[in-house]
UniProtKB/Swiss-Prot annotation:
The gene is rplK. One of its GO terms (biological process) is translation. It comes from Limosilactobacillus fermentum (strain NBRC 3956 / LMG 18251) (Lactobacillus fermentum). Part of the ribosomal stalk of the 50S ribosomal subunit. Interacts with L10 and the large rRNA to form the base of the stalk. L10 forms an elongated spine to which L12 dimers bind in a sequential fashion forming a multimeric L10(L12)X complex. Gene3D superfamilies: Ribosomal protein L11, C-terminal domain (1.10.10.250), Ribosomal protein L11/L12, N-terminal domain (3.30.1550.10). GO terms for cellular component: cytosolic large ribosomal subunit. Keywords: Methylation, Ribonucleoprotein, Ribosomal protein, RNA-binding, rRNA-binding. Forms part of the ribosomal stalk which helps the ribosome interact with GTP-bound translation factors. This is Large ribosomal subunit protein uL11. SUPFAM superfamilies: Ribosomal L11/L12e N-terminal domain, Ribosomal protein L11, C-terminal domain. One or more lysine residues are methylated.
Length: 141
């Protein structure tokens, strides 16, 4: 028989840098998860993606065991890395802060494809371009 799910916790944690300190520790402690067990496993699984913000969905079962799924980094994080900026524009319609090429957008769309609700890469590219425009980026090409 399948285990009963007690809780689902969604967090965004820097890859390879999960620690028992806030905000990770309290969120996991409330759910009844072994914090050290989770942080060690998460850091081992994301060690190759250092510096990225990784969304994680943790499923906690009634016997206090857990599973977790790591997702691809948010599109905004990938766009900022591709453009080489730290922040998007506060006024995206008037202040353009960076430029990204169609090739960069395609690369990001291919990376994000498994997490996006898109039929093909072109649809995923349109989603990523929309995110870029809403951040004050210009899409060239």
């Amino acid at each position: 028989m399948a285990k009963k799910v007690a809780n689902v916790v969604k967090l965004q944690i820097p890859a390879g840098a999960a620690t028992p300190a806030p905000p990770v520790g309290p969120a996991l402690g409330q759910a009844g998860i072994n914090i050290m067990g989770f942080t060690k496993e998460f850091n081992a699984r994301t060690a190759d993606q250092k510096g990225m913000l990784i969304p994680v969905v943790i499923t906690v079962y009634e016997d206090r065991s857990f599973d977790f799924i790591t997702k691809t980094p948010p599109a905004a994080v990938l766009l900022k890395k591709a453009a080489g900026v730290e922040h998007g524009s506060g006024e995206p319609n008037t202040n353009k802060v960076a430029t990204v090429t169609k090739d960069q957008v395609k690369e990001i769309a291919e990376t994000k494809m498994q997490d996006l609700n898109a039929a093909d890469v072109e649809a995923a590219m349109r989603m990523i371009e929309g995110t870029a425009r809403s951040m004050g980026f210009v899409v060239e090409g």
